[in-house]
């Protein structure tokens, strides 16, 4: 049995939760999110708490209900606080800038890369070498950050490229004569 799945998700004041069959909806100060729980997992909302339990004792149901509980906890955190991912740009001439509703990246190519920001995601550029991705859905925030990083992942010799804040880049030694 999952230790995470056994804990109920407490819904704070200011957040309204509705459970309609297998769909869990959260509405809070930052917005609204929903999550469809797998059929092998049972969801109940009572006394300001969302409880998750496996419908049967199969391995699949037991493995899914801890995940469902974590996803529901992410809904609560997303509509109250939101999620944030920071990226750092390293390299001579590498920089980022906002261009209207798009993110413009100079990453050493012959042209600038223009990234269209999807709906529900906010990107800020406090410095030309820092990018902050924020939103209420952790999956979308992580996906956008990964897409930006994929334009120029950090290389192991000089560490040039786009990396997550706090990410360790394994460095290699260059060729020897």
Curated annotation (Swiss-Prot):
Pfam families from the UniProt entry: Ribosomal_L6
Leader sequence range is none
Any one cellular component term from GO for this entry?
Answer: cytosolic large ribosomal subunit
Q: List the SUPFAM superfamilies.
A: Ribosomal protein L6
Q: Does the keyword Ribosomal protein apply?
A: yes
- Which Gene3D superfamilies does the UniProt record give? Ribosomal protein L6, alpha-beta domain
Task: Give the Gene Ontology MF terms in alphabetical order.
Answer: rRNA binding; structural constituent of ribosome
Kindly state which keywords UniProt assigns to this record, in alphabetical order: Ribonucleoprotein, Ribosomal protein, RNA-binding, rRNA-binding
Asked whether the UniProt record includes Phosphoprotein among its keywords, one would answer no
Its BP terms in the Gene Ontology are: cytoplasmic translation
What family is this protein classified in?
Belongs to the universal ribosomal protein uL6 family.
Could you describe the subunit structure of this protein?
Part of the 50S ribosomal subunit.
Free-text function comment from the UniProt entry: This protein binds to the 23S rRNA, and is important in its secondary structure. It is located near the subunit interface in the base of the L7/L12 stalk, and near the tRNA binding site of the peptidyltransferase center.
Quote the protein name from its UniProt record: Large ribosomal subunit protein uL6
Source organism per UniProt: Bradyrhizobium sp. (strain BTAi1 / ATCC BAA-1182)
Its gene is rplF
């Amino acid at each position: 049995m999952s230790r995470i799945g056994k804990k109920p998700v407490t819904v704070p004041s200011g957040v309204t939760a509705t459970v309609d069959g297998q769909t869990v909806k959260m509405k809070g100060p930052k917005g609204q999110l929903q999550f469809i729980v797998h059929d092998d997992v049972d969801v109940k909302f009572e006394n300001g708490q969302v409880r998750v339990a496996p419908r049967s004792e199969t391995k699949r149901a037991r493995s899914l209900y801890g995940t469902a509980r974590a996803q529901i906890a992410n809904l609560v955190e997303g509509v109250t606080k939101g999620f944030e991912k920071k990226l750092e740009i390293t390299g001579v001439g590498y920089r980022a800038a906002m261009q209207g509703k798009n993110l413009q990246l100079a990453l050493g190519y012959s042209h600038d890369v223009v990234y269209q920001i999807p709906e529900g995601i906010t990107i800020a550029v406090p410095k030309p070498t820092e990018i902050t991705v924020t939103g209420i859905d952790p999956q979308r925030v992580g996906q956008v950050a990964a897409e930006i990083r994929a334009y120029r992942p950090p290389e192991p010799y000089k560490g040039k490229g786009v990396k997550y804040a706090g990410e360790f880049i394994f460095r290699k030694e260059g060729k020897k004569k």
